[in-house]
Amino acid sequence: MELLDHDIYKGPVRERVTYTIPNHPYLSLTVHHSRELDVDLKDITEEMIIDSGTLTAEDLFMTRGLRFCDDSVLWAALAEKVSVEFQRRGKTTMDLSAFMSLLERLTFEDETSAFYRLLTKCTALAHFSILEYIVDGEKRDTISAHFNRLLELLDSLFLQFLMLRNRSESNTLLTLFDILPNPKEIYGDAASPTSVLLKHFLSDYIFVAYASSYRFVSSVLCSCDQCRASLFRIYLGKKDSRAVNISDISEFDPADLILGQLHLDAREAVALRAEIDRDLGSSLILNSMERRHLPILHDKQLGRGHFERNILKVYCNIVLCLFLLRRVKQRIVSDLTAIARFFVKAISEMERCIDTVSGLHGVRIKLLVVSSQFEIKDPMRVPRLCFFFLEIVTILVSGYDKERHRVRALLEHLCLKKICLGDLCASMRLAREIRHDVLEGFLNTLELSYMSNPVRFFRFHDCNLYGTHMWSGVYPNVVPYAVRGGGSFDIRLQEHRRRQKRIVLRRRLIRRVQQRGLDIREARRVPKLACVTFI
């Protein structure tokens, strides 16, 4: 059936239209010079009213003065980072540069002062910093979660490397393991993952030892044409053009050292470079961990034998993960430094504008103290400083009236149950879909754990980048140290696999509920398109 124009209003244009939620007189909205919406406010239940308290940026993220469309776009961008349930159709969430561009495009109501405009942008950036750069629960599309997944993967790969060494009987292979230091091996035992051990993965000593040993490792383990040609060049004393340096490379091509030392052909190297350029390999690592196979060389036939092939595959994946880990950590430090500079500049401007706002003179000293703390040299403290800034924001916005976007969200929900509202903005459409699913009961409401229980949220240091409390466990086909601990190994392994199965079933159930909500929402709508946008 073709979509036809459908009017969501009724009656003529009126000078003043007031919408008041039944039994809740404080939830009212007055619109001037508009027609009345053709909706029944009695359809709004008490559950919808309760759930709507977190469906706008001004209610959940303490922003002020934004117009409804910009409030919805900002809310959708931050809501996707709160929980994995709110991510849609494999869509990648915003990085820092995209979010900063979003802040620059925000539009405010005409009466909003310059102070509250700056405060809203700083508040949104503070929430973004905490959600993006602190690992928490099941968040999957943040750079900190990518960093933590790389640590989990490296921990398993180093443990595999240790197990392969214990099975080696050849003196040549033992010599190979001797020149490749293993952080997991301490006095002949496997060390459990701790923040101190995981930081050691980033050391130059580990990276240089693995990145500079490719020629020797490949010559010992593999006899393919590529490795034999490289060995022949070494025998003739010719320099390998692919080996440029062993430092981190910001801009590289397939002929450079790292991609040239992963036993990849030209096509595979170009594809890997595209993955790294797009999202620093986040989708590559995530897909490999979900499918339980190695990021690269999983199905490739190489090596002199089965045992040598396993060693070479683990070695090449360790080199790749070490390289990605250093690149991701460099990006995190760079982003947090840029955020700190933004706060120093913005708070300085807010301090000059605070005299124009009545009743806020006592907060000036607190703003100056927070601004001085953002000038510190340790960028890893920025997310925690953002939380301190949010504590001041609760004082600053307490006396500022909201724009009643909560009522607009409820009216929007009633319209969505009848017709499809026409919008070209993908972010606005995403916000409407998520809000509609929450109000229909298909999704849980949002909760900011760092605001409701900050002590529990910040119980780990280093922005939780090195926290292992959310690690999924067996990867790839390696039992983690926590499972191998005391008690019967078979029983603990079975318990671990049952726990992994429950996690998979839970994620599958979430996807089914989301799809069910989408089907019901589309079935309830009249297949007509509104000729005007929502208020």
UniProtKB/Swiss-Prot annotation:
Source organism, top-level taxon: Viruses
Protein family: Belongs to the herpesviridae U4 family.
Name of this protein: Protein U4
